[in-house]
């Protein structure tokens, strides 16, 4: 079985992989607070950097928030608010690392427990488990059945992110290539794991559409013209990188029909969506062939000026073994950037592709079984016990997944402050409460607004499952990691999501040092 390098991924050296590069993102306008609600947001939010040696913890600004002082009546200064919790006026492009104080007081477990037990209650049936840990020391601050296996929903993507960053590498890019075929007028579109292709020109500043089929077709047409090919040109597709069933039998047919996922292939347009802006609705059931046919259409258009035509239709074939003649290629955004997108949008299709690419990088089969084995192995290599963990998929759609809140808290701790600095690349992907991703429309009422901008966490939702795992800096400047998971819940009960958000908010606003 070909490894990821042979599949066309451009892989970096270990030294390159272990030195993450922070890139500023385009600033977003600050979101207005709900009427009558004052939000306390951090000075620095959008990238948290934990230095491995000299500075145990730090908050990176890339970009960050700058906020004014808060004043009470008649100009009287209000109680002092830590700088990371001040109200923002705008996003800043500044890039610095502001270290957190490693001597900041650790919350008292009894105080944390008292607060969370009052908040973490189900709305109707079911129950919650939860774990809170001090990120620097690993000290447990809260544990409600933390070792109990749970259906985690999309919190599973945290494990997949770890596996992708470790096994594939943060700076790796996936290559989609056009190869010379068995005859001069036959070409082969070779899939290399990029499922975020766009159908237009490549967009170097983008993640979705970073590599474009129009650019690939234009470059391929020029190469064919330079070789004197007159056509008609036959397009074949080699998508044999992945093996096993493309559709996981553990997934509900209703979820597949609704477009929550689709059969998994190593090439797709728009993460197997019908258009770049689509986030719901049915997906193509053969994303690889859909992408190949779109490429053939672009090649037909490019060939008109290059003096050749394209045979209608695309058939599957295998690329020739040995040295391959590459006519053209385009590369994806980096794995770190794709992980960011996966976590922010909770992209099931991209998560499943990452699992298979991680498996190939580890010398396993690019299948669902290979993916689940690779993800479990990478988590175990972090020193996290996986004896009772069971993975049925790597996106979190399967009800057969069994992972504990403690395992998720430990994974978040590994990302924020563990020794493997490659995992820091996942930090920017955690949605920010009230601002970005799947938390963008939450934390807007009076009971959760003080967590807005402070809580960064991966969400997870299935019919009777809800989960939230992430990190937060409390009022004393202590970095905490947490995981809350509810199972057997009453479907549609609004109070369950609120219970999670209030619990995370309590951590953000809790000094909890007994003073």
Regions found by a protein language model. Give the residues of each.
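Small-residue-rich helix-loop
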Residues: 143, 360-515
């Amino acid at each position: 079985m070909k490894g990821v390098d042979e599949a066309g991924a451009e892989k970096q050296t270990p030294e390159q992989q272990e030195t993450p590069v922070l890139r500023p993102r385009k600033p977003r306008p600050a979101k207005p607070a709900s009427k009558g609600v004052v939000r306390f947001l951090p000075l620095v939010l959008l990238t948290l950097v934990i230095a491995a040696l000299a500075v145990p913890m730090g908050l990176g600004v890339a970009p960050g928030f700058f906020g004014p002082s808060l004043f009470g009546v008649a100009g009287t200064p209000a109680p002092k608010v830590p700088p990371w919790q001040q109200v923002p006026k705008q996003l800043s492009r500044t890039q610095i690392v502001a270290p957190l104080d490693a001597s900041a007081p650790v919350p008292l477990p009894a105080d944390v427990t008292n607060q969370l037990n009052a908040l973490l209650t189900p709305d109707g049936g079911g129950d919650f488990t939860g774990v809170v840990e001090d990120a620097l020391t690993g000290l447990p601050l809260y544990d409600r059945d933390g070792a109990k296996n749970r259906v985690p929903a999309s919190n599973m993507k945290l494990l997949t992110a770890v596996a992708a960053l470790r096994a594939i590498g943060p700076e790796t890019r996936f290559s989609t290539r056009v190869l010379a075929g068995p005859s001069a007028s036959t070409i082969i579109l070779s899939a290399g794991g990029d499922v975020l292709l766009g159908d237009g020109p490549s967009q170097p500043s983008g993640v979705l559409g970073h590599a474009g089929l129009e650019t690939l077709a234009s470059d391929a047409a020029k190469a064919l013209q330079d070789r004197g090919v007159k056509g008609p040109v036959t397009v074949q597709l080699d998508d044999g990188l992945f093996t096993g069933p493309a559709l996981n039998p553990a997934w509900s047919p209703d979820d597949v029909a609704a477009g929550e996922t689709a059969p998994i292939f190593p090439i797709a347009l728009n993460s197997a969506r019908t258009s770049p802006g689509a986030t719901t609705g049915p997906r193509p059931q053969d994303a690889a062939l859909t992408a190949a046919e779109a490429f053939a259409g672009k090649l037909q258009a490019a060939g008109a000026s290059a003096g050749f035509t394209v045979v209608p239709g695309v058939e599957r074939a295998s690329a020739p073994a040995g040295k391959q003649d590459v006519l053209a290629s385009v590369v994806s955004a980096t794995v770190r950037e794709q992980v960011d997108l996966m976590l922010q949008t909770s992209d099931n299709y991209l998560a499943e592709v990452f699992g298979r690419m991680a498996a190939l990088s580890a010398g396993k089969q690019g299948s669902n079984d290979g993916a689940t084995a690779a993800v479990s192995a990478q988590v175990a290599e972090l020193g996290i016990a996986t004896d009772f963990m069971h993975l049925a998929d790597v996106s979190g759609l399967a009800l057969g997944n069994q992972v504990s809140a403690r395992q998720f808290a430990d994974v978040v701790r590994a990302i924020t402050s563990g020794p493997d600095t490659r995992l820091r690349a996942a930090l920017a992907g955690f949605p920010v409460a009230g601002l970005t991703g799947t938390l963008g429309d939450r934390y807007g009422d009076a009971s959760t607004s003080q967590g807005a901008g402070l809580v960064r966490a991966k969400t997870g939702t299935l019919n009777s499952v809800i989960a939230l795992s992430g990190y937060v800096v409390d009022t004393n400047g202590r970095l905490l990691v947490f995981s809350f998971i509810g199972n057997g819940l009453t479907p549609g009960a609004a109070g369950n999501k609120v219970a999670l958000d209030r619990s995370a908010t309590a951590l953000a606003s809790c000094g909890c040092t007994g003073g």
